[in-house]
């Protein structure tokens, strides 16, 4: 297979808002969800073989209740800091989303999948189509 023919897709929760605190709260569930995969890695590989930033962010995790999987406001996300939320999700005003998507494009990403489970799915999709993708 020709490696140059491979396309890269990225996926993340996203929320467009000038209110950064609100945006973070709407997507904090995503890094909490990802923490399940991080815990799997920690259980499979020696801690020293993993990036410190990866295992450090789950140190204060106290389990995960799948009854509240991918749920805005879930207690599953109590341990997730603003810094981790910012690194795992795309949050902030339209300009911040454009910048993140441009950075992903420059890194070779050809498709971006927005996880919209945020309670305002239609409004967020409309903003993405009108002001981010269509701009």
What does each model-found stretch correspond to?
Residues 1-106:
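An alpha-helical appendage that flanks or caps ligand/catalytic pockets
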Residues 17-18, 119-123:
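Flexible loop/turn segments at secondary-structure boundaries
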Residues 116:
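Residues that line or immediately flank small-molecule/substrate-binding pockets and catalytic motifs
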Residues 121-135:
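C-terminal helical cap(s) of enzyme catalytic domains, especially alpha/beta-barrels
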């Amino acid at each position: 297979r020709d490696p140059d023919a491979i396309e890269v897709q990225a996926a993340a929760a996203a929320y467009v808002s000038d209110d950064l605190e609100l945006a973070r709260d709407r997507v904090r569930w995503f890094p909490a969800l990802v923490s399940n995969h991080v815990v799997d890695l920690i259980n499979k590989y020696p801690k020293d073989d993993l990036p410190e930033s990866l295992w450090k962010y789950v140190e204060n995790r106290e389990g995960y209740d799948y009854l509240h999987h991918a749920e805005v406001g879930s207690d599953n996300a109590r341990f997730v800091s603003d810094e981790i939320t910012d690194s795992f999700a795309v949050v902030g005003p339209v300009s911040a989303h454009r910048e993140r998507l441009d950075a992903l494009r420059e890194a070779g990403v050809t498709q971006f999948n927005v996880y919209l489970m945020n309670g305002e799915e239609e409004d967020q999709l409309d903003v993405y189509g009108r002001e981010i993708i269509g701009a």
